[in-house]
UniProtKB/Swiss-Prot annotation:
Binds 1 [2Fe-2S] cluster per subunit. This cluster acts as a Lewis acid cofactor. It catalyses: (2R)-2,3-dihydroxy-3-methylbutanoate = 3-methyl-2-oxobutanoate + H2O; (2R,3R)-2,3-dihydroxy-3-methylpentanoate = (S)-3-methyl-2-oxopentanoate + H2O. Its EC number is 4.2.1.9. Homodimer. One of its GO terms (cellular component) is cytosol. It comes from the Bacteria. This is Dihydroxy-acid dehydratase. Its cofactor is [2Fe-2S] cluster; Mg(2+). The modification N6-carboxylysine is found at residue 121. [2Fe-2S] cluster binds at residues 119, 193. It comes from Trichlorobacter lovleyi (strain ATCC BAA-1151 / DSM 17278 / SZ). The gene is ilvD.
Amino acid sequence: MRSDMIKKGLERTPHRALLKATGIPQSQMERPFIGVATSFTDLIPGHVGMRDLERFIEKGIHSGGGYAQFFGIPGVCDGIAMGHKGMHYSLPTRELIADMVESVAEAHRLDGLVLLTNCDKITPGMLMAAARLNIPCIIVTAGPMMSGRGVEGRAYSFVTDTFEAMARYKAGVIDAKELQVCEDNACPGMGSCQGLFTANTMAILTETLGMSLPRCGTALAVSAMKRRIAFASGEKIVELVHNDVKPRDIMTRAAFENAIRVDLALGGSSNTVLHLLAIAREAGVDLPLETFDILAKETPQLASMNPAGKHFMEDLDIAGGVCGVLKQLGDKIIDTRTLFGLTTRQLAASIENVDQEVIRPLSAPVKKEGGIAVLFGSIAPKGAVVKQSGVSDKMMLFEGTARCFDSEELAMAALMEGVIKAGDVVVIRYEGPKGGPGMREMLAPTAALMGLGLGDSVALITDGRFSGGTRGPCIGHVSPEAAEGGPIALIQDGDRILLDIPNRKLDLLVDGATIEARRAQWTAPEPKIKTGWLARYAKVVTSAYTGAVTTAD
């Protein structure tokens, strides 16, 4: 075992002394040392329930014959970090998390890891660490929040009933009393936000990849099932250590294709593009951005999940969960290995009945193409991403007039002041991985568009990214970004822009000579942040089309 390097032999006498100082009995020294990387914090609703899960994981590890050792990992709530300086830090924490897990596991020669996670950047960071370390690992996602319920019985959810409600109030659609009801009911307790936002999409994809146990991706945070999964995961990691089953044995190219297909079938968050690219890179899997679009054209959307649809995570869990989606996708799923022991097709076959109102069959899809599309064109030579599952039919082909803003704050002010009108294309730039820095989510302006009733008449494009809660004609991840001199930096107010999602086009309708003249006049702006972690991050982060990862190159 790896841990023998710190606990066996004469020369390890000091190491054993230090281990015994933590309370480890001599009788436990022969057991596998299992690290539990816990991202518990009472700052985040998705993570406040983890103390209970930690206990069940620990019980499972000891039941399985291992010895549990806990260490902490930070977490950021994107909802709380939204709309201010804090959002600059969200995506960069993904890299920090991967680095921290790697550091602790290597420094202490842990035999295996249980990675307890839930929210947006924590789960991909944990998966990146697992792929990079390639020692036995299992993921436990803490589970989604229940939908809120008001006195009149209707369901409430975070994005629709907070960010969008704020804009509806500003527009006079609802009054202050109704807004307060929304605020009080949108988030009823612990768990990741209720819809198919980034956290829940990543939990589902983790299960699809084979890196968590069945139902882990959808079982609610408050459920007893989640605790049983935590216990079983603790037992399973000891088995994985003994059998030397490693993440790269599971996270193969075929497993990533399955994850993308499930993502597309459910209409998941566009952030998953960034994260899957980054995880695949750590796993040594070649996964070009174009893969998402190739698979989208042959994978129909089978579910209509909140925020664009009516179903919540609790509905998906009851309907059959990830195994139900695999079953409905049928032969489109490749038979791959999972940590659980059964293959993906065996897991699909284990589900007898699927609620076809929630997870439709291939013969009756919600839409004929998957939820995510990759666009190219003169604005995005290296690509841009849109969650087409959240775009109305009317806006799939749209030509509009550019209204340019060099930050999210400027765009948000224009929206709330009524400057943006039907027929406009809001361009938010210098918000990419380098230019932001940190590639902030544009949830506030996109929610404002919907709340103001502009979702069928105004498009938004950015080199930033979007929350999983975003819906509407919102195109992000535009590459190259403005800070690198990408074409998005050269757009001017009044330019005409063509958005053609069916033909995967995003074009600036300005002649080439004019564009080149503008390029000759363009100079890179001064960095927005010049000190601290973000200044270092901006120097080493790559473009969105490669996953916005940090490299030593």
